[in-house]
Amino acid sequence: MFLFSLGGNMYYIAYGSNLNKEEMKQRCKDAEFVSLARLENYTLTYRGNPGRAYLTADKKKGDFVRVAVWDVSENDKKSLDEYEDYPYLYDCFDEKVLLENNETITGFIYQMYDRFPICKPSDSYMERCKQGYRDMGWDASILDF
């Protein structure tokens, strides 16, 4: 059950390549940026297979992941499900995040199944993720493998 925004859409918690504003504009036509936020008790990990590894947010007490919150439509959610290869590669569930204004909201997030090993991503994928970090005004070097 996904929580809906005031406009009737859903809140999507994004990290990785979905921080990239240009890609999100192409992927999710109705998406609107809401806020930067922190996903508490998670850490970023690359998982997958050699040359096909992607970022995921793994549980890790005491750590946090910088994320963006997007207001997305039902059509955007369908597009994201396809992009994230849900439910085969990633699971999707509700999670709480701490917004910049210290409010907490709940949105949906994708997390890769931990059956996939930690693995080095392709340079092109890493660059797309780094562009997203730069788009948000963050230091992209944290994404180096």
Residue locations for each model-derived region?
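Glycine-aromatic micro-motifs
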Residues: 6-145
